[in-house]
């Protein structure tokens, strides 16, 4: 523990100011017992990390206090983390459970019953139930989500509490509306106004409270977490009197929670305001407190312990440490799509759930892609919708959250998406110059050549002398425009100082004002300079070539067909109208130059084709929709060009590459590693060591 937990706690502390903040962190508590523990904590840590204790009546009241800047932090269960998102709060630190050898930032939601009764999970109607609290993960959202199909509930606007009150004969659901639905509070035993209270003032509140409701024979089933039985019954002989209800309508011993649980749930998290939330001060408070008062350092005051008969005050007693949550992660990313879907299912009608599942949402990067996507949607006979993001990474995040379902990505971003758990669905096969057949959905993808293009008149530049010239890139993290050329240069120089390779550059997605953005021009009004979308005129393959053609740069990193697609009358835009392909040449790795038609013999690397990506559970639906759309609007589709063409753009390469012949099936390459190939994956992994990607950092946290 002494080695492990400090290492976890140190994660993300680089650059953190270790000095005590001028104003302390105000911690929100919800009961007399929590307030007492908080005051002890305050007195023990005040010399290094001043803090204050703010009392409110419920977790929701704490959320509101933090949003109103009357408090700064509170620990919440996943269901309340979701609620906090609506108040613009985000999780900043996750509780770590388990052991030093097997740490985890999740727990299992389980349904516990006593042995000797033969009912199963699908036979709970009319039983007496014990819950941790309304809107909480293990005690409400997960079990009620699973039981929804058994409820007499059509969905909003009818209250869900009303349906649950009719389903169980009696319950204790702390935080429920006992006046409107007395059955939900019938089993609770708090005195007076504390009956069914949303805090430990109600004895059956929380995990241990719900279990005691079962243990004392008040209820028939308790919805808690996997460790609750172990924490309350340390003797195996006592635990053996209980069992778990499994989703397959069987029962298993309480030790079998990994095989018999209702869901895996993200651990409790400390939340703060998304903006001006004192995140660094909160983390430093947790970091110092865990070192001094954690389980590896026995003291009179224990941060992860509760005095007397109390349980889980401020933090879960089972916590062994904290893990800093990357700044890119908001509440929805933290909770994950399966949990978000479960919560959504409790807030929608059956028809709304079905409609949401039936549609496919395509993510468009920038306004030009959105315009094309909407044209596509208006012509499509399928349930196709569009969402907008400013960057490719933001689109990936939308797909992760379920706000979008698919998009087509270059190989560099396929790597990023794959690291985040997304999968390739269909590949963009380039238009074949050897065949005009439309029967190529099953043709294996061959990729394309990443090339370095220069003006023929600029004869002094070779690959060996390219350093110090002015460069034009498609965008940061894209294959031909960034990953391949910069990877080669890193290998040659041993340096990760990208902004020193070239005298000036346009690499959309770089830090604004940096050398890597010096050549970028933004849109026609000079706005959005260096943004990684079509608002930047030098973005993408065509944009990078335009940067070269307009004499802004000396070398453009693009793909083999880019010059041919934009010269000799192929691009009628004013800037390209008079361009000729023989005015440009390719730089070869051996220091020679060749005509742009000889990319096969003069290229930097073979790059994997662009591909459509989606979530694994949505991939089959996305594939079916796209193959149907392709038959109608593809290069050989019956309604292209009369109504709409997938592979044509008013500018260039919107949604898909314009030279795509067909979206082809993957021939078994259904993971990002298989699709990209081990050589490319290794090369990108090595290049990523040169810089920190907030999205990859976030995905590493989520995939842990």
Curated annotation (Swiss-Prot):
SMART domains: TR_FER
Glycosylation sites (chain numbering): 385, 491
Disulfide linkage: 28-62, 38-53, 130-213, 172-188, 185-196, 246-260, 363-395, 373-386, 420-699, 472-547, 496-690, 506-520, 517-530, 588-602, 640-645
GO cellular component: early endosome; extracellular space; plasma membrane; recycling endosome; specific granule
Post-translational modification: Poly-N-acetyllactosaminic carbohydrate moiety seems to be needed for TLR4 activation.
InterPro entries named in the record: Lactotransferrin, Transferrin, Transferrin-like_dom, Transferrin_Fe_BS
Presence of the UniProt keyword DNA damage in the record: no
GO biological process: antibacterial humoral response; antifungal humoral response; bone morphogenesis; innate immune response in mucosa; iron ion transport; negative regulation of apoptotic process; negative regulation of lipopolysaccharide-mediated signaling pathway; negative regulation of osteoclast development
Gene Ontology MF annotations: iron ion binding; serine-type endopeptidase activity
Leader sequence segment: 1-19
Entry superkingdom: Eukaryota
Residue positions binding Fe(3+) 2: 410, 448, 541, 610
Residues noted as binding Fe(3+) 1 in the record, renumbered to the chain: 77, 107, 207, 268
Residues annotated as domain Transferrin-like: 25-348, 360-689
Active site: 88, 274 (nucleophile)
CDD domains in UniProt: PBP2_transferrin_C, PBP2_transferrin_N
Protein family (similarity comment): Belongs to the transferrin family.
Name of the protein this chain belongs to: Lactotransferrin
Organism whose genome encodes this protein: Sus scrofa
């Amino acid at each position: 523990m002494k080695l492990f937990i400090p290492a976890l706690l140190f994660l993300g502390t680089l650059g953190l100011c270790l000095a005590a903040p001028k104003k302390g962190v105000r911690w929100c508590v919800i009961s007399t017992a929590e307030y007492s523990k908080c005051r002890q904590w305050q007195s023990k840590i005040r010399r290094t990390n001043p803090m204050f204790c703010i009392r409110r009546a419920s977790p929701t009241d704490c959320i509101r206090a933090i949003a109103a800047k009357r408090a700064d932090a509170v620990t919440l269960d996943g269901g309340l983390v979701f609620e906090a998102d609506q108040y613009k709060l985000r999780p900043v630190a996750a509780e770590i459970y388990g052991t030093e050898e097997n740490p985890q930032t999740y727990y299992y939601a389980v349904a516990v019953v006593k042995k000797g009764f033969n009912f199963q999970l699908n036979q709970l109607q009319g039983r007496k139930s014990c819950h941790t609290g309304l809107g909480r993960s293990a005690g409400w959202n997960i079990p009620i989500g699973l039981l929804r199909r058994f409820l007499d509930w059509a969905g909003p606007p009818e209250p869900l509490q009303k349906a649950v009150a009719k389903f169980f004969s009696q319950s204790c659901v702390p935080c429920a509306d006992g006046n409107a639905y007395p059955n939900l509070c019938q089993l609770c035993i708090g005195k007076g106004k504390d009956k069914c209270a949303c805090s430990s003032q109600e004895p059956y509140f929380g995990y241990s409270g719900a279990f005691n409701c079962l243990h004392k024979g008040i209820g028939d089933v308790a919805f808690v977490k996997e460790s609750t039985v172990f924490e309350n019954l340390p003797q195996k002989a006592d635990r053996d009197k209980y069992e778990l209800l499994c989703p397959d309508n069987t029962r298993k011993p309480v030790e079998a929670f990994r095989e018999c649980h209702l869901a895996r749930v993200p651990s409790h998290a400390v939340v703060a305001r998304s903006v001006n939330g004192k995140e660094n001060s909160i983390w430093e408070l947790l970091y110092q407190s865990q070192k001094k008062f954690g389980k590896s350092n026995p003291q009179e005051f224990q941060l992860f312990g509760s005095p007397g008969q109390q349980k889980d005050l401020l933090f879960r007693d089972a916590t062994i440490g904290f893990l800093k949550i990357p700044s890119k992660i908001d509440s929805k990313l933290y909770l994950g799509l399966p949990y978000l879907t479960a919560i959504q299912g409790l807030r929608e009608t059956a028809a709304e759930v079905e409609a949401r599942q039936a549609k496919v949402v395509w993510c468009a990067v920038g306004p030009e892609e959105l315009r094309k996507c909407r044209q596509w949607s208006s012509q499509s006979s399928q349930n196709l919708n569009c969402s907008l993001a400013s960057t490719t990474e933001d689109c990936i995040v939308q797909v992760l959250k379920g706000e979008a379902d698919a998009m087509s990505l270059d190989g560099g971003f396929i790597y990023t998406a794959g690291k985040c758990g997304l999968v390739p669905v269909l590949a963009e096969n380039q238009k074949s110059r050897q065949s005009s057949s439309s029967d190529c959905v099953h043709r294996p993808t061959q990729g394309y050549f990443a090339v370095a293009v220069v003006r023929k008149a600029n004869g002094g530049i070779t690959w060996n002398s390219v350093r110090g010239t002015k460069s034009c890139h498609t965008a940061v993290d894209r294959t031909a425009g960034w990953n391949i050329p910069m990877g080669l240069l890193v290998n040659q120089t041993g340096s990760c100082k990208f902004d020193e390779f070239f005298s000036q550059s346009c690499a959309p997605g770089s830090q604004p004002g940096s050398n890597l953005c010096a050549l970028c021009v933004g849109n026609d009004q000079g706005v959005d300079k260096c943004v990684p979308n079509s608002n930047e005129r030098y973005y993408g393959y065509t944009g990078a070539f335009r940067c070269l053609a307009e004499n802004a740069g000396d070398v453009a990193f693009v793909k083999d067909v880019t010059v041919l697609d934009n010269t000799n009358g192929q691009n009628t835009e004013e800037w390209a109208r008079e361009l000729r392909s023989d005015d440009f040449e390719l730089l070869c790795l051996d220091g020679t130059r060749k005509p742009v038609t000889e990319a096969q013999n003069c290229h930097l690397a073979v790059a994997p084709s662009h591909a459509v990506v989606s979530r694994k559970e949505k991939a089959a639906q996305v594939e079916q929709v796209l193959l149907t759309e392709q038959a109608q609007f593809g290069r050989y589709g019956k309604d292209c060009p009369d109504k709409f063409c997938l592979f044509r753009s008013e500018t260039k390469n919107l949604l898909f590459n314009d030279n795509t012949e067909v979206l082809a099936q993957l021939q078994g390459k259904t993971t990002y590693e298989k699709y990209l190939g081990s050589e490319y994956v290794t090369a990108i992994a090595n290049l990523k060591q040169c810089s920190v990607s907030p999205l990859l950092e976030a995905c590493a946290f989520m995939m842990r």
